[in-house]
Amino acid sequence: MTDRAPHYGLLGLLQTPTQPPKDNPPKLPEKQRRRGRDTTRNRRLFASDGPTDEEGPEVPEIPPSDEEKENRPEPLPVVENGWHSFLRETLEHQLGRLQREVNQDFEDLYRRLGIHP
């Protein structure tokens, strides 16, 4: 046996090669390190001064005006009308016809192959 990496075929081309971890990441200059510390400290100091975006101020719910009520379209009632039954019957008929065609095709294929179900 050899100590080679496993071969994944074309899938191996899609995987990114792994790099060994770096022992010591480069250090930032002192000024940038201080700046980073200062901003995190300032964020912690001033975090409780006001509402955050998540909380937001409470806004009372305003009822819609008469004009908005007039412009709002009326919801369509969902009832079993003639179109629904017509569409359902048509779809049932088409599905039944397709099922018969598929069954006939399979019977023909079985017959050609000499398979008797």
Curated annotation (Swiss-Prot):
It comes from the Viruses. It is found in: Host cytoplasm; Host nucleus. Residues 24-41 have a biased composition (Basic and acidic residues). The keyword Phosphoprotein applies. One of its GO terms (biological process) is symbiont-mediated arrest of host cell cycle during G2/M transition. Residues 51-68 have a biased composition (Acidic residues). Phosphorylated by host ERK. The phosphorylation triggers a structural change that enhances keratin binding and protein stability. Keywords: Early protein, Host cytoplasm, Host G2/M cell cycle arrest by virus, Host nucleus, Host-virus interaction, Modulation of host cell cycle by virus, Phosphoprotein. Residues 1-78 are annotated as: Disordered. One of its GO terms (cellular component) is host cell cytoplasm. The major E4 form is first synthesized as an E1^E4 fusion protein from spliced E1^E4 transcripts, such that the first few amino acids of the E4 protein are derived from the N terminus of E1. Contributes to multiple aspects of the viral life cycle including viral genome amplification, suppression of suprabasal cell differentiation and egress of newly formed virions. Induces host cell cycle arrest at the G2 phase by associating with and preventing the nuclear entry of host CDK1/cyclin B1 complexes. Inhibits cellular DNA replication by preventing loading of host replication licensing proteins MCM2 and MCM7 onto chromatin. Within the cytoplasm, associates with host kinase SRPK1, a splicing factor regulator, and inhibits its activity. Belongs to the papillomaviridae E4 protein family. Assembles into oligomeric complexes. Interacts with host CDK1. Interacts with host SRPK1; this interaction may favor expression of late viral transcripts. Interacts with host cytokeratin components KRT8 and KRT18. This is Protein E4. It comes from Human papillomavirus type 63.
